[in-house]
A protein has these predicted regions:
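Transmembrane helical segments that form the transport core of multi-pass membrane transport proteins
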Residues: 290-420
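Juxtamembrane and boundary regions of transmembrane helices in multi-pass small-molecule transporters
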Residues: 213-214, 223, 232-281, 449-506
């Protein structure tokens, strides 16, 4: 799911990946926490070190009602804009705060203030801070790249943009690729009557599927990289699955876009850019800054400083602090050195990133007990799921790993989910890259591919939604999007399951 950052491959959230998670404890799954920032700050002022009674949140003692605030928030996101759009857009921050409070208050009352503050400090300082810094930096830098010229939203042009974005997503990350290309794509299709499907397929391909080939592509794979999976392992083991998935989805897009394009041509189109206008890219310095962002994130993972700062039980490692400072500096540099007219030409505003920040904060506050319950494994409330993962001989069912990892990644943060199933499969990188390579492949596919099933499955999904909505595209509701994703992606995933997991090719 959404998001989420786990150290982040330019696409999502940052999850605790530098230490193994003991069964029954919660490292605080995901990146999110705007609302928890204040509590975390209070925790820092309160002492800076964790008191003896601040035990880790034990998922095995949490009953199922702890899931309700998370489900309530998801339902609010799903139906709020649909049933009461004006009220939702005016008060969604308050609604997010309400559900977050319904998670945090019982947590403090039943498990102790110290435990709650330690958990929130970890979430805010160890997860959300890096998450929002990376997303904001990419949003700012990509917003300074202005593509001008006769870029018309024909099926050929649209397919080319989607294919290009899919190809570069594993290099600059799904968030990076999405933020670079979404505005030119919207501008190219602004005169078309039917353009919603273009954005929906853009989310499928560029914001998710394209990131499956490197740790820089999507947060779950970066988590695997930090746990010992070699940098090029995903490229060598997932290229066929990614190629087939992307090809099938792109073929579906071309068919749909041709059909809608023919409908649009029956109506006079106004406001098109003249065909003889050359394509010009302005703000080229921001392309260099994108490369610099990738380098900073990669180097932060490779550099082991051995220096850390303990803040109320959350260790901030020096390389992570340096990375975040460098990313903020890059964002500032983009704002300073990019002419204002470039962002004005892109229709750049701060509202989309603010909306993402608030919603993701609430999601990951509410997800705290859910993730703890998942980490409890066989002793936890979700123990009934685990027998589905192995056959009668104890061998892993790769198809089950794919679908369960993917289903949870569609509604939870995909990076923590990757880590949960990574540990469930043994947690040993050498074994998973060797004899259990098909299982690791299934986990990676599920975490990356199925993040496209919902708006909250991966961080860039909702950013794209927010940008498109602000630009006047009538994006489908939460459930409306799931109808699109279910109709297009589920059959594709079924084919991929049969070809690679049930009847694997040699």
């Amino acid at each position: 799911m959404i998001s989420r950052l786990d150290v982040l491959p330019l696409s999502g959230a940052r999850t605790e990946v530098r230490q193994k998670v003991p069964a029954g404890s919660c490292p605080m799954s995901a990146p999110s926490k705007i609302g928890c920032g204040a509590l975390a700050a209070g925790a820092v002022l309160a002492g800076g070190t964790v008191p003896a009674n601040a035990a880790a949140l034990q998922g095995l003692v949490l009953p199922w009602p702890w899931v309700l605030p998370f489900l309530g928030l998801l339902l609010s996101i799903a139906v709020g804009p649909l049933l009461a759009p004006k009220f939702w857009h005016a008060h969604y921050g308050k609604i997010v705060f309400m559900w977050s409070a319904l998670t945090v208050t019982p947590l403090a009352a039943l498990h102790g203030i110290a435990t709650a503050l330690a958990a929130l400090a970890h979430a805010a300082l160890g997860e959300y801070l890096s998450f929002i810094i990376v997303l904001t930096t990419l949003y700012v830098v990509a917003g300074g790249i202005l593509v001008m010229g006769s870029l018309r939203g024909t099926p050929l042009v649209n397919a080319a943009i989607l294919a290009f974005g899919t190809a570069i997503a594993s290099i600059v990350g799904t968030t990076g690729a999405a933020m670079i290309l979404i505005r030119p794509l919207l501008r190219a299709n602004s005169a078309r009557l039917h353009n919603v499907h273009v954005v929906v397929f853009f989310i499928f391909l560029v914001a998710n599927i394209g990131g499956a080939l490197s740790p820089l592509g999507d947060p779950p794979l970066f988590v695997g990289f930090l746990h010992g999976i070699s940098f090029f392992w995903n490229a060598t083991h997932l290229w066929r699955q990614t190629a087939l998935t992307a090809a099938l989805v792109l073929a579906a897009f071309i068919a749909v876009d041709i059909w809608y394009y023919r409908q649009d041509r029956r109506v006079a189109v106004v406001g098109e850019t003249p065909r003889n206008e050359p394509i010009v890219v302005r703000g080229m310095i921001n392309l260099l800054l994108i490369v610099l962002i990738v380098g900073v994130i990669l180097l932060s993972a490779l550099w082991k400083s051995g220096v850390g700062f303990d803040i109320y039980g959350t260790t901030l490692e020096l390389q992570d602090v340096v990375r975040d400072i460098a990313l903020v500096a890059i964002a500032v540099a983009s704002l300073v050195f990019t002419p204002d007219e470039h962002r004005e030409g892109n229709g750049f505003t701060w509202e989309p990133i603010l909306e993402v920040a608030k919603l993701f904060a609430g999601i990951f506050i509410c997800i705290i007990p859910v993730t703890a319950m998942l980490h409890a494994g066989h002793a936890g409330p979700f123990s009934w799921v685990l027998p589905l993962m192995t056959d009668e001989t104890g061998a892993p069912r790769d198809a089950a790993y794919f679908w369960l990892t993917g289903t949870l990644s569609a509604v939870l943060d995909n990076a923590p989910n990757y880590l949960v199933f990574f540990e469930l499969a043994g947690g040993d990188a050498a074994t998973l890259m060797g004899e259990l390579a098909p299982t690791l492949t299934a986990i990676a596919m599920g975490a990356v591919f199925m993040g496209a099933l919902t708006y909250i499955g991966n961080a860039p999904n909702f950013m794209i939604y927010a940008i498109a909505t602000e630009r006047g595209v009538k994006m489908p509701s939460f459930f409306g999007y799931m109808i699109w994703s279910g109709a297009v992606l589920l059959p594709v995933f079924a084919i991929v399951t049969y070809v690679f997991l049930i009847r694997p090719l040699p």
